[in-house]
A protein has these predicted regions:
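The Walker A/P-loop phosphate-binding site
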Residues: 1-108, 117-118, 122-130
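Conserved beta-strand segments of the P-loop GTPase G domain that flank and frequently precede/overlap
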Residues: 84-85, 109-111, 186-189
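P-loop NTPase motor core
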Residues: 114-189
Length: 189
């Protein structure tokens, strides 16, 4: 049969619809906040991506960290949390209002002396997502990511913005991996 030939050539890439739906129906819905949960149908589902957008100081980081605290609870699987501190602005103020956050268990990725490129941040995030099932990946913020070319070129150099293309390719590359890993990716703008 065609299916057997495809499986022989590509591996177990064909499954029945009932298998897929059964697997997906077991995905947990994790609450974010009462107001957002109403709009989201109860919260964020494992294996999804979400973008938090809003004005500066509107609570995007705090909301993401509160969601991380919920994910760390036993009720929601004691999920590992990785926080990409792209802006380098994670402060105790962000953490103080977050009930139940286990800060000692969060892995914070951020530049030290030298700035890190968008490619470095995205590669690190990809590695964590691929190797850490059920993780929560917070990228704060995607608008602060700087492609390597822009980091090394002169400020006056003429070039086309490459961040949208980088993000598009990164999302495409991880599109099937995030659901398989039951990861949740939160990107703050």
């Amino acid at each position: 049969s065609i299916t057997k030939d495809i499986i022989k050539k590509y591996g177990p890439v064909v499954r029945s619809g009932s298998e897929v739906f059964e697997e997906r129906s077991s995905f947990q819905v994790i609450p974010v906040s009462p107001a957002l949960d109403i709009a989201l149908g109860g919260g964020l589902v494992e294996g999804t991506w979400a973008t938090f957008m809003g004005d500066p100081k509107s609570g995007k980081t705090t909301t993401a960290l509160q969601f991380a605290a919920t994910c760390q609870s036993e009720e929601h699987g004691s999920r590992p949390v990785i926080y990409m501190d792209v802006e380098g602005r994670l402060k105790s103020m962000n953490l103080s209002g977050v009930h139940g956050l286990k800060i000692e268990e969060i892995k914070v990725v951020g530049a030290n002396d030298e700035p890190m490129s968008a490619e470095q941040y995205l590669n690190i995030a990809e590695t964590y997502i691929k190797q850490t099932p059920n993780c929560v990946m917070i990228v704060d913020s995607i608008s602060a990511l700087i492609p390597e070319k822009e980091l090394i070129d002169d400020v006056n150099a003429q070039f086309r913005p490459s961040l949208p293309k980088l993000l598009k390719n990164w999302c495409k590359k991880l599109g099937g991996i995030v659901p398989r890993q039951r990861a949740i990716v939160l990107m703050i703008v």
